[in-house]
Amino acid sequence: MTDGDYDYLIKLLALGDSGVGKTTFLYRYTDNKFNPKFITTVGIDFREKRVAYNTQGPNGPTGKAFKVHLQLWDTAGQERFRSLTTAFFRDAMGFLLMFDLTSQQSFLNVRNWMSQLQANAYCENPDIVLIGNKADLPDQREVNERQARDLAEKYSIPYFETSAATGQNVEKAVETLLDLIMKRMEQCVEKTHIPDTVNGSSSGKLDGEKSAEKKCAC
């Protein structure tokens, strides 16, 4: 896909305490590589990836495919950057809420992140995936799977245990979030009769996307 050659621009925001592995997770997803030497994110950064999304009907794929440009925003987990992070909440259409399986404190802080997310996101029930990262370190694990799944069930969101080091469930977690977002947008399109693809110039596409996003964000 060339620049501007896409049907939808989707912005995802990675949230969680500093050190849970947000940067390495996103790097694994976009580049399929692992770099354990990333320094702590200062402020906010983002990565990009183009993907093809195939719509799913009750009996499987419908054959309709969309070209999606993903912007994956990587936020700083430190308290001093919290106000900067929350400023990006309203622009994001989905959230990767992450904790470190080897840190009980990062798991306990998920509730704080969820409170901030619910207070600042584009709608009351945004699309979220809960991620327990660093699944490749079982000997250092402090959070058991049942704990995490119970929390995910409380918030009615999917849960994945991932590893940026091995790639375990990284793509699956992002694809699940994208699927939730696209289905929400499809429902909004059906209700408002907005064309589900916008042809013409790239600026026309963005106008169409913003219109769909605004109507879906309620």
Swiss-Prot record:
Its EC number is 3.6.5.2. Its main location: membrane. It is found in: Membrane; Late endosome. The modification Cysteine methyl ester is found at residue 218. GTP binds at residues 16-24, 74-78, 133-136, 163-165. Residues 206-218 have a biased composition (Basic and acidic residues). It comes from the Eukaryota. InterPro entries: P-loop_NTPase (IPR027417), Rab27a/b (IPR041837), Small_GTP-bd (IPR005225), Small_GTPase (IPR001806), Small_GTPase_Rab (IPR050305). GO terms for biological process: anterograde axonal protein transport; exocytosis; positive regulation of exocytosis. Expressed at an extraordinary high level (0.1% of total protein) in urothelium. Keywords: Acetylation, Disulfide bond, Endosome, GTP-binding, Hydrolase, Lipoprotein, Membrane, Methylation, Nucleotide-binding, Prenylation. A motif (Effector region) lies at residues 38-46. Belongs to the small GTPase superfamily. Rab family. Interacts with SYTL2, SYTL4, MYRIP and MLPH. Interacts with RPH3A and RPH3A. Interacts (GDP-bound form preferentially) with DENND10. Small GTPase which cycles between active GTP-bound and inactive GDP-bound states. In its active state, binds to a variety of effector proteins to regulate homeostasis of late endocytic pathway, including endosomal positioning, maturation and secretion. Plays a role in NTRK2/TRKB axonal anterograde transport by facilitating the association of NTRK2/TRKB with KLC1. May be involved in targeting uroplakins to urothelial apical membranes. This is Ras-related protein Rab-27B.
